[in-house]
């Protein structure tokens, strides 16, 4: 008779979870940050709020963002004026948009990832879908399964309203699934659409205005699996270790609440300080077992919540400016896409590493870290091992 331990051993993969493909997608509508304040105050009928507009212009100028992509066009906003007020009841209109657009954008990214992977989609065993918007039943995971034509018995996991740390969460879950289910191939999708958070300006709630200056739309997809098939599957990064923690004394630092007026965001000014104060502890826990204490010797992927967070982390750890190059590039070209950001940065890093003729996918280095920061304040940590190019 076969023992339970023998069954468990047979169920487990031998090697670490590996990212085998990455795909990204954005809406077609591109918004230039330099002209966005004019557009935003005009479309929300707020041009008379000149002092507030000047504040918003300064926020956009300091954001280090060049452009963002948004599903919400001028035409859509004119057809849905309730979205342009500060707190007008508008949830129905928002929901009608995102329940369609979130899976659609996710499909676009997933198709690219599956194409790079090079295997038939029938080999996908698990699906993890993550989005901050559009809670619905059946969920976006179900809709994507139908849109892609995946097998009906794909094992699905749906994550709603986790926010900006969740790019790390999906990697942690994918790692556990791939390593504990021999032969598993996990499709991971993060799809974020800001139609649920867009609203007009308020003189009294400037933290809402910060979100309007930073957030953009985008979707990213990965294929994750252990024990890659030689000559068929091409590893990009290996996931070695993961952790999640709630930063002490951080309650209320980042909050989001679903209301009749959509999803409202609330930020404390000291979010960059809270993150930078707790980052060293997370790094020690992650890299002490590897005997690494020089954090300039590893590659960096950090959720770009905004430039102030990156600046303070750099200063606290004495990081060289080039450490955050891939992270800042994605912030500049796409804005803050919540959970999808760190996956975009993974893609940016492996592509630039190959283009520059470096020896590994991680900017020529062997070890790296990926951080997600978001509501809670929650910190996700993923230790990555790069792959030779």
Curated annotation (Swiss-Prot):
The role this protein plays is: The primary product of this enzyme is 4,2',4',6'-tetrahydroxychalcone (also termed naringenin-chalcone or chalcone) which can under specific conditions spontaneously isomerize into naringenin.
Q: What is this protein called?
A: Chalcone synthase 6
User: So what family is this one in?
Assistant: Belongs to the thiolase-like superfamily. Chalcone/stilbene synthases family.
Q: Which CDD domains match?
A: CHS_like (cd00831)
Q: In which pathway does it act?
A: Secondary metabolite biosynthesis; flavonoid biosynthesis
Which SUPFAM superfamilies has this protein been placed in?
A: Thiolase-like (SSF53901)
Check the record and name the Pfam families matching this protein.
Chal_sti_synt_C (PF02797), Chal_sti_synt_N (PF00195)
Q: What class of enzyme is it?
A: transferase
List the PANTHER family. Answer: CHALCONE SYNTHASE 7 (PTHR11877:SF62), HYDROXYMETHYLGLUTARYL-COA SYNTHASE (PTHR11877)
Can you tell me which residues form the catalytic site?
A: 164
Q: What EC identifiers does the entry list?
A: 2.3.1.74
């Amino acid at each position: 008779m076969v023992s339970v331990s023998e069954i468990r051993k047979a169920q487990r993969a031998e090697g670490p979870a590996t990212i085998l493909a990455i795909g990204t997608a954005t809406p077609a509508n591109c918004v230039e940050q330099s002209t966005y304040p004019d557009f935003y105050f005009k479309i929300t009928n707020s041009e008379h709020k000149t002092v507030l507009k000047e504040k918003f212009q300064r926020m956009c100028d300091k954001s280090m963002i060049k452009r963002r992509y948004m599903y919400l066009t001028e035409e859509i906003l004119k057809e849905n004026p309730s979205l342009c007020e500060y707190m007008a009841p508008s949830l129905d209109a928002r929901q009608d948009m995102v329940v369609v657009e979130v899976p659609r954008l996710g499909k676009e990214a997933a198709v690219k990832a599956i194409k790079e992977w090079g295997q038939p989609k029938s080999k996908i065993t698990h699906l993890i879908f993550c989005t901050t918007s559009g809670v619905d039943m059946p969920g976006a995971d179900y809709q994507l399964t139908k849109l892609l034509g995946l097998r009906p018995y794909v094992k699905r996991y749906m994550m709603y309203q986790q926010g900006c740390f969740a790019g790390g969460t999906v990697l942690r879950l994918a790692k556990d699934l791939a390593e504990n289910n021999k032969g598993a191939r996990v499709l991971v999708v993060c799809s974020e659409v800001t139609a649920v958070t867009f609203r007009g300006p308020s003189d009294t709630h400037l933290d809402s205005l910060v979100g309007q200056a930073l957030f953009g739309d985008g979707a990213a997809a990965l294929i994750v699996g252990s024990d890659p098939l030689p000559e068929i599957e091409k590893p990009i990064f290996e996931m070695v270790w993961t952790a999640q923690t709630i930063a002490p004394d951080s309650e209320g630092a980042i909050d989001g609440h679903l209301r009749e007026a959509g999803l409202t965001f609330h930020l404390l000014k000291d979010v960059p300080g809270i993150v930078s104060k707790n980052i060293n502890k997370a790094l020690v826990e992650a890299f002490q077992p590897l005997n690494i204490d020089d954090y300039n010797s590893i590659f960096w992927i950090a959720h770009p919540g905004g430039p102030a967070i990156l600046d303070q982390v750099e200063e606290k750890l004495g990081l060289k400016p080039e450490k955050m190059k891939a992270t800042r590039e994605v912030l500049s070209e796409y804005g803050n896409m919540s959970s999808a950001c760190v996956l975009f940065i993974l893609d940016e890093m492996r592509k630039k590493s190959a283009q520059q003729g470096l020896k590994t996918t991680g900017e020529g280095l062997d070890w790296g870290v990926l951080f997600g920061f978001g509501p809670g304040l929650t910190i996700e940590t993923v230790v990555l091992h790069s792959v030779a190019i």
